[in-house]
Amino acid sequence: MSVCSSSSSSQKTWIVNGILAGTAIAAAIGARAYLGRSKKFRSRVVGIIPARYASSRFEGKPLVQILGKPMIQRTWERSKLATTLDHIVVATDDERIAECCRGFGADVIMTSESCRNGTERCNEALEKLEKKYDVVVNIQGDEPLIEPEIIDGVVKALQVTPDAVFSTAVTSLKPEDGLDPNRVKCVVDNRGYAIYFSRGLIPYNKSGKVNPDFPYMLHLGIQSFDSKFLKVYSELQPTPLQQEEDLEQLKVLENGYKMKVIKVDHEAHGVDTPDDVEKIESLMRERNMS
């Protein structure tokens, strides 16, 4: 590898397609009221791809080559296909990443090394942008095959859910990934709001084994924030569950904020370790993706 040179019923009640989420929720809250404000409410959207070079599991991950292109470029190219984003930037504290991104045409915002996670990096980048935005989409740079429809889905879910400050997406978890701590699991309530996220298996049954018949949910890295809340988030102190699980979204839940979750039909292909690169490349060859 080289771096860059240029089915329970309760579950079913909230499972909605990301693209149709807007219509379904709008009907629930009153289509007339929703349509009357849709052009103004959370309408300006920016996608931010936070990227850092240092990583305990995979140093230099954003720049790793995937079939001839750096991973950060592949994520950026997929993100540009989303119809809800008015602008896309890469936020990084590393000049190597910045130089690479500028080389393929991406806008770059330099951020400080003190950012503790991608969400804080997004907030710092947002403050440095000249234009004002209502929604910020945190697009994980290690999802080179992210579907643009998923980006659109989480944006629309946040736009039509006024009491939520955060939205994200989940997909079905493969039984063999049930005990993998790199595969974050999620449980939701009957209205589609997040209850909890964990690196462990949730829910966890008395047998201590993965139930192949239970619809476990896998969290996808894509996250959408109300821009005003993003500033609040950065000022909140780290919380016990967030620190124990090392999952930044838990700070949102621990402080009592609501998070909307949509379920999508998507096979997750994140890059967590060097071994994942070969898997991604094999899949892309199978799909004739260049």
From Swiss-Prot:
A matching Pfam family: CTP_transf_3
Primary site of residence: mitochondrion
Pathway: Nucleotide-sugar biosynthesis; CMP-3-deoxy-D-manno-octulosonate biosynthesis; CMP-3-deoxy-D-manno-octulosonate from 3-deoxy-D-manno-octulosonate and CTP: step 1/1
Enzyme Commission number(s) of this protein: 2.7.7.38
Localization (cell): Mitochondrion outer membrane
Domain of life: Eukaryota
GO MF entries: 3-deoxy-manno-octulosonate cytidylyltransferase activity
Membrane topology: Peripheral membrane protein
Keyword Cell wall biogenesis/degradation recorded: yes
GO CC, any one term: mitochondrial outer membrane
Known catalytic reactions: 3-deoxy-alpha-D-manno-oct-2-ulosonate + CTP = CMP-3-deoxy-beta-D-manno-octulosonate + diphosphate
InterPro entries assigned to the protein according to its UniProt record, in alphabetical order: Cytidylyl_trans (IPR003329), KdsB (IPR004528), Nucleotide-diphossugar_trans (IPR029044)
pH dependence: Optimum pH is 9.5.
Keywords from the UniProt entry: Cell wall biogenesis/degradation, Magnesium, Membrane, Mitochondrion, Mitochondrion outer membrane, Nucleotidyltransferase, Transferase, Transit peptide
Activity regulation (record text): Inhibited by 2beta-deoxy-Kdo.
Span of the transit peptide along the chain: 1-50
Tissue specificity field: Expressed in roots, leaves, stems and siliques.
GO biological process per UniProt: cell wall organization; CMP-keto-3-deoxy-D-manno-octulosonic acid biosynthetic process; pollen development; pollen tube growth
Cofactor(s) recorded in Swiss-Prot or TrEMBL: Mg(2+)
NCBIfam families recorded: kdsB, PRK05450.1-3, PRK05450.1-5, PRK13368.1
Role summary: Catalyzes the production of the sugar nucleotide CMP-3-deoxy-D-manno-octulosonate (CMP-KDO). CTP is the preferred nucleotide donor, but it can partially be replaced with UTP. Activates KDO during the biosynthesis of rhamnogalacturonan II (RG-II), a structurally complex pectic polysaccharide of the primary cell wall. RG-II is essential for the cell wall integrity of rapidly growing tissues and pollen tube growth and elongation.
Other remarks on this protein: Rhamnogalacturonan II (RG-II) RG-II is a structurally complex pectic polysaccharide present in the primary cell wall. RG-II consists of a linear 1,4-linked a-Dgalacturonic acid backbone with four distinct side chains, two of which contain apiosyl residues. Boric acid forms a diester with two apiosyl residues from separate RG-II molecules, thereby covalently cross-linking two RG-II molecules as a dimer.
PANTHER family: 3-DEOXY-MANNO-OCTULOSONATE CYTIDYLYLTRANSFERASE, 3-DEOXY-MANNO-OCTULOSONATE CYTIDYLYLTRANSFERASE, MITOCHONDRIAL
Protein family according to the UniProt entry: Belongs to the KdsB family.
Listed name of the protein: 3-deoxy-manno-octulosonate cytidylyltransferase, mitochondrial
Source organism per UniProt: Arabidopsis thaliana (Mouse-ear cress)
Upper classification of the organism: Eukaryota, Viridiplantae, Streptophyta, Embryophyta, Tracheophyta
